Amino acid sequence: MANLGSEAEREPLLGPGSPGSREWSEIETQEHYKSRWKSVRILYLTMFLSSVGFSIVIMSIWPYLQKIDQTADASFLGWVIASYSLGQMVASPLFGLWSNYRPRKEPLIVSISISVAANCLYAYVHVPAAHNKYYMLIARGLVGFGAGNVAVVRSYIAGATSLQERTNAMANTSTCQALGFILGPVFQTCFALIGEKGVTWDIIKLQVNMYTAPVLLAAFLGILNIILILFILREHRVDDLGRQCKSVNFQEENTDEPQIPEGSIDQVAVVATNIVFFVVLFIFAVYETILTPLTLDMYAWTQEQAVLYDGILLVAFGVEAVLVFMGVKLLSKKIGERAILLGGFVVVWVGFFILLPWGNQFPKIQWEDLHNSSTPNTTFGEIIIGLWNSSREDHSEQPTGCPIEQTWCLYTPVIHLAQFLTAAVLIGTGYPACSVMSYTLYSKVLGPKPQGIYMGWLTTSGSAARILGPVFISHVYTYLGPRWAFSLVCGIVVLTILLIGAVYKRLVAFSVRYMRIQE
């Protein structure tokens, strides 16, 4: 909080020693402080590797799927990509609940082991004689299931940091996550040098090529992560003021000693924050999904151009997110997390409002049939098909523009490139600010109680948004066009802003709500 000096983080802190309670009698020594932050940094790495595990194969899934199973089509590709989020959605509350009652090492090691095994399965999906595409579906779903440990990571960091440290720690977590999404495709590009044939070990039926090398690297990094967790991670817990506490996971039951009444969690604030986080991830999924189809339709780009330019834009988006994460750490100390959350949604609303088409200039119409249409039929993952095919096709005769099958192309004005880029900057600023502030506030609202299951539900809401967002924008954009699509998104953002305004006073730290400390 504002009245706590930053130097206090490094000083030994003496608990108040409340009668009848041993929990608050601990002192945070310098050794404990170093061990606590060493453990937190191990979980930063875990978050980074989880993101890399998702993004390191995202651009090569389609060609690999075609190679192992000729019956796979674009629709099945959408299921393969969505299976990651489905797996994470199911696993998050389970791992979160587990972490509430047992040492966090257990769900972390089990979840990472599942991811390692799933990545190895992905490398061997070419071996079965039939139904290979379903093995890939299972592999990606299990990788997502292993990524459910995000709930454990966030709950650990929330419990191992004081209120003053929390925003910085959560921002660092988001930074590592964003870096994982950025660097994953970079690793994939490097492995492309190996080629499709690569090297084969017949004895173990292992093919190391441009498709399998990335997942084998992810599996190796996962094993290193398990080793670090086993030997470095320690159970740490501090209260909102930073005083050392005994971890709930190891606290012995003692019915003879009275317990300090902790108060109840504000469930209204909990539900509201889950809704807010759902909208945050929904917005990102919508924007990510619509990016390439929109540029194909509005600017008559070829698929090669769209993949190149939009890929550059997404990398810039990730870099901008990292800068925003670093910026909010400083800004939150001056204006608070709630103001940043509200301001972030306002910026996002302005971004989508700018994307609304105006004027009397219309996009180029594509009169010819285009088999690989720019219509976003399922998810952003289908656009990966264009990335792989673009390097093999002759684009000199490829029809470009807004396909006539989308009737709105005939009467909807074009979105000018300046509009598009301005909106990208604004959305790229607002989204990461809203993301980190939403689960930072969430962790503070929950207070000193174990947060595993609650963080699991938060991660589940985010996974659901990543599944539903592409479905929503695909149908609305295809049949009604960008004006309706972005207008509805603006409406959703306005409703979310009103929700934040309604619960604004409730979005305070647990200790502040019960007046144990002053905000």
Swiss-Prot record:
Region (Disordered): 1-25
UniProt note: phenotype after gene disruption: Retinal degeneration associated with blindness.
Catalytic activities: chloride(in) = chloride(out); iodide(out) = iodide(in); fluoride(in) = fluoride(out)
GO biological process: apoptotic process; astrocyte differentiation; autophagosome maturation; autophagy; cellular respiration; determination of adult lifespan; gene expression; gliogenesis
Span of the annotated motif Dileucine internalization motif: 13-14
Residues glycosylated per entry: 372, 377
Pfam families in the cross-refs: MFS_1 (PF07690)
Family per record: Belongs to the major facilitator superfamily.
Record's protein name: Major facilitator superfamily domain-containing protein 8
